[in-house]
Amino acid sequence: MADVYIIYAKENRATALKVRDYLSASWSVWLDDFIVGDFNVAIKESIQQAKCVVALYSSFASKPAVTGELSLAEKYQKKIIPLLLDDSDPPYPYGHLSSVDFRSWPGAIDHPTFQLLQKKIGLVVAPRAKPARLAATAGGALALPNVFMSVSSHETQFDPVDALSALRIHATSSILVSAYDLIHSQSRDAMVEEIQTYRDNGGFVLIDSGNYEAHRLNDTRWKPAHLKKVLLNTPHDWAFCFDNMKPSDKFDVAVRQVVRAVERDAKHTSAPMLPIIHIKQNEAGLARLPRIVRAISEQLRPPIIAIPERELGAGLAQRALTVRQIRDELDKLPYYQSIHLLGTGNPWSIAVLAAAGADTFDGLEWCRFAVDPSSERLHHFQHFDFFRAKRLRTDLMDVVDADEDIGYAGKVAFHNLEYYGEFNRLMREMYSTGDTESFALGVTGLKSVELRKLFPGIFL
């Protein structure tokens, strides 16, 4: 007995197959691939036994084969969820059903359109398994898990425009840029030019709200209008909303504050606007957090939901446990919701928090510290001399070492970027095969028994 039966015209078979493949991660799905015996009998029995019907509506859906199956679905009182594939009228007389607009669906499982379908099916029949971790998001443009290389003027070794230049030259896959610097930097025009060139070369740009810098500098004049200006004048793929740094301690109000912030800032960009959640820094705040994240996911269905790592608990063990609690709550949804941790660039932290259930991270570590690739530990920037001989042997680093015009800071930065590029690649490769613990063991150098003792419930 299948959970979901898909009705479609043969002209829409490619879409039907993709929908079937994606839904099969959480439900049993019937498609007419493997009919044995009488075709009509098999269809009638399968519709009768199915718990939910998904029907593809297009200009081809008025064919008798489609309307006949719709008639059977109504006869057996099945819940029918139409997917509108084009601008044609629904097949008569089945235009009264609540539908999902698939006309602009790009074919990605993490798209809000497909998540709405998953949510509707979940109201009829519960998923058989928790949603599968995504291998990519943003329509495949951003592989997961992922560490964004951040750019900021606050306590880093580089002016933002120089940092952007290094990231462009390195061809780093994804970056996070603070809106604060895109307003206050004297080089903001050059920054925008660097960002445009970076995107033209295939890079992925995430704009941050700028509240991190404003908070650190005690700048009370930083307002949503500043972010609006940045969104209107800076090329980007995603943007974080102007987050509310003083959240309510009431559940409903806290959720509403985040949703309103996203809706306000989304008016100024065609790119996805992403929520940032802050919580009261107490036991009650941490206890509410998983439910708040889930509620915001259900209302907005954003590509990612961001939470500052520093607000997840006092130590890494507590933070990992909080992430796991959030993931457990999100796993009750019929679709996968990705989590972003703000300010997480330490390799050891990433290895543990990704295993706990986080998907994307960002950090300034690449332009603040020097990474020892053998221990995967961070050191003072000037301590690069202790392990520069251990650097990754890559063509880029050979060029960097040979170029006398690249100063000490530049050599450290490119060394770090090469490290994080390989870190990202290896993390994705091992996560694709479920080797989350093996990845953490490799990064930290700990033994399995030590890792499990330190982080109970994360590594089993």
Predicted segments with their positions:
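Short beta-alpha junction loops
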Residues: 59-60, 84-89, 209-213, 244-246, ...
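C-terminal extensions of enzymes
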Residues: 127-155, 159-161, 393-460
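Glycine-rich phosphate/ribose-binding loops and adjacent secondary-structure elements
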Residues: 271-399
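Conserved N-terminal substructure of TIR/SEFIR domains
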Residues: 1-56, 74-78, 84-88, 92, ...
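Short loop/helix-cap segments at secondary-structure boundaries that form the rim of catalytic
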Residues: 88-97, 353
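Non-catalytic, usually N-terminal nucleic-acid engagement modules in DNA/RNA processing proteins
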Residues: 127-270, 428
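Conserved acidic residues
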Residues: 51, 173, 237, 303, ...
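A cross-family glycoside hydrolase active-site/sugar-binding cleft signature
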Residues: 7, 32, 147-150, 176-180, ...
